[in-house]
Amino acid sequence: MSDNPVKEEVQQFDKKCLKKTNTAEKNTLPTKEDIDQEKKAAEGGK
């Protein structure tokens, strides 16, 4: 298994050549008001 060229390359990879990136939160959680509105809409539809 040690003769696998991909595994050898991964072990020799230098993390210093990676660039730092800033991540942006895309999936925000709903507010309490949003949840309440959805509950009221669901109850009204029954």
UniProtKB/Swiss-Prot annotation:
- Compartments in which it is found: Cytoplasm, Cytoskeleton
Q: Where is the composition biased (Polar residues)?
A: 21-30
What are the GO BP annotations of this UniProt entry?
A: actin filament organization; regulation of cell migration
Q: InterPro entries this protein is in?
A: Beta-thymosin, Beta-thymosin_sf
- Give the keywords, sorted: Actin-binding, Cytoplasm, Cytoskeleton
What terms describe the molecular function in GO for this protein?
actin monomer binding
SMART domains xrefs: THY
> Where does the source fall among the domains of life?
Eukaryota
Q: Which Gene3D superfamilies match?
A: Single helix bin
- Annotated segments matching region Disordered: 21-46
Q: Name one GO cellular component term.
A: cytoskeleton
Chain intervals with Basic and acidic residues compositional bias: 31-46
Its function, per the record, reads: Plays an important role in the organization of the cytoskeleton. Binds to and sequesters actin monomers (G actin) and therefore inhibits actin polymerization.
**What is stated as this protein's family in its record?**
Belongs to the thymosin beta family.
What is the protein's given name? Thymosin beta-a
Taxonomy of origin reads: Eukaryota, Metazoa, Chordata, Craniata, Vertebrata
